[in-house]
UniProtKB/Swiss-Prot annotation:
The keyword Ribonucleoprotein does not apply. Belongs to the intercrine alpha (chemokine CxC) family. This is C-X-C motif chemokine 17. The gene is CXCL17. Keywords: Angiogenesis, Chemotaxis, Developmental protein, Differentiation, Disulfide bond, Secreted, Signal. It comes from Bos taurus (Bovine).
């Protein structure tokens, strides 16, 4: 019984990685596909990379600490702060959830941290 449970726990990260990797490329334009790289790095337009550990070592959310070697921000660095709403903007509120690029970056980082070395 213990062997069965332990083998299932070992296979779970592999199944998650295969599901995420197959679903991340469906419906994506060819030009956007080149922006992604494996191993937790996010290739930006300038050719610089943002790594998972760089992001998780930063200060808490909404207090951005720019690393001195990075000139462009990571996908999750862009945050639109709360601004005073005018009459027309009150009805079109955006939620404070991160962008799609940031969500993809963070899920990739979390999956890599769960993956066990084989």
């Amino acid at each position: 019984m213990k062997v069965l449970i332990s083998s299932l726990l070992l296979l779970l990260p592999l199944m998650l990685m295969s599901v995420v990797s197959s679903s991340s490329h469906t419906g994506v334009a060819r030009g956007q596909r080149d922006q992604r790289q494996a191993s937790g790095r996010w290739l930006r337009e300038g050719g610089q990379e943002c790594e998972c550990q760089d992001w998780f070592l930063r200060a808490p959310r909404r207090t951005l600490m720019a690393a001195p070697r990075l000139t462009k921000p990571c996908p999750c660095d862009h945050f639109k702060g709360r601004m005073k709403k005018t009459r027309h903007q009150r009805h079109h509120r955006k939620s404070n959830k991160p962008s799609r690029a940031c969500q993809q970056f963070l899920t990739r980082c979390l999956l890599e941290s769960f993956a066990l070395p084989l």
